[in-house]
């Protein structure tokens, strides 16, 4: 399209007079930062590099049993000494060379002597040899199983159970069975543990309290087992076995894993009604239930009851309290838990520091978290792999890759070997739009290092691919996970909801939530938050209203900080002012601290609705809360002034940003001021701001020119409007259909219908994708009143 009129742009510094004099002064908008800013090769190099050989751990000295075991004959004592002094790698050959002598001896007595002298590895080797020779009975197996249990060798217990079956008609004692059950639970072999428990009862072995507690723990770790837990508790009481503090904490922890808050409270109250006095472990478990549910008020009530009943909080109590504050957004209160612990003579541990660092990370205060990390090291705590993983995750979210590399180097130098969680953290860091290949490369590196994929890894992969916008790969990982034998958990379903929330596919999201419930899972605050995001993205206002009713009406969903924050954001995306105000008031009424996202959302909605006084009140609240306004805050404030026809005030803020050392305006900032001047009919001022925008190195976008076109059209300056459109096309910026409509509507308001048709003809020649039928019909309707 050719420019018409008196040559609007050649006289302005923002536009070139012609291509022969100089190149275009207005370049295309700069591309988004390349994903290659993530130094993936360097990160993978750190992760795959062999860890420095750790200093050899001091082994427990293995000396001749002292005093000599009276139950052994002199020959047997000599044999035990020979076995225990022989190197493990060649022990099997040594045992074979003494076969006849060993078969004449009492294997169980030899095993007992080895176990009592601390030689459990030699005892295990002897038992395996005896098993192959058919010389191991149930008592021998019991002896070694209990020894392995005391040493925490759960994998060895499981392997021994698989390779050394009991002779027909024999059975272990209840202590040995309980040890095996515990080992199977720790190894994640829950179904095998339950099979063994059923076998134990078939054999007539009466479970002890410890046995029942271990099986309750199995159910808790399995998840979705509340009816079975209740049934087992009834069985315990019927057998005359009363629950103890460990039983209580185990059952409540099971409720915590599945988000069963009501069930946990009912069980706790029933315990008290039966005369049980809760101990600190039980109270701590209940604190964790409320903490993970985001209900910090109930957590504080539990703490008060605990102290009132003379049960002194311990370090775990304050760890849970700090975690509760962290999840509720109270980072300052979480940090104060460290001071409270010190005042009570309690030493914080690595978990305490990790929890407070998480609180800082949740509100984006990474520098404060790093300062606490340094403080932790100065006070003598050696960061473990969990601490490093936590810090790496925070740095990754903020794209502070240089510091990430330094942290990985420090981790390697300290002899802290990256584990599966470290790899999972790297997968999560790569989970950003446009970085799908990075996720795949990290996954390949993980597999090449022999790191086995766990359920957590698959959950991370589903979420990472979802953030990359790859629904196909996300669901592929879900299918691969189930094919590998992993059972989806609530984290898995939430990861799938995260994928769907980015597409607004609320219908599929609802089916996922239904499936969760069918499988026995209770949606948690994250589930509802993601479902709200699905509704918001898909424009399903009725869906948002349904969850609001569960939060404010029936009380089926607890109004945690996460839920209320998401309600503010979801209603904002759907432009539901009433819904936003209700959620915002609930945030304040419940004592939560609104974060900058909540404040900015409220400021923006008030600005868009021209509610000057309320917007100003929100801005003042931001400053009073100690938060620092960001660019979104100032853009919303400029939008408010622009909509109130105070564009000069909006420009003042723009100029302040231009002079700021810490924050610079973006294209939205300039567009907002330009739009304000255009709406006031001050097109020359708008064009002046455009000139300054280009001079400041900010490339205008299609919205910038669309706004200017609208400003000229509203003043019936059609030549100028068409010249702007021509300039856009010349510089590779495609006008929106709405841009063309603004011009046509202005022509029609001016009763210049033929010029409107001529404009459409010119557009159709230069924009081959433009379908002019709808606008032609609009002109006909405007001209003939149809």
Swiss-Prot record:
Q: Where is the composition biased (Low complexity)?
A: 37-50
Q: How does it assemble?
A: Forms homodimers.
Q: Which family does it belong to?
A: Belongs to the PPR family. P subfamily.
Q: Where is the transit peptide?
A: 1-95
Q: What is the protein's given name?
A: Pentatricopeptide repeat-containing protein 10, chloroplastic
Q: Which domain of life is it from?
A: Eukaryota
Assign the protein's first listed, main location to one coarse class.
Answer: plastid
Q: Where does this protein reside within or beyond the cell? A: Plastid, Chloroplast stroma
Q: Does the keyword Chloroplast apply?
A: yes
Q: Which InterPro entries match?
A: Pentatricopeptide_rpt, TPR-like_helical_dom_sf
Does this entry carry the keyword Iron? Answer: no
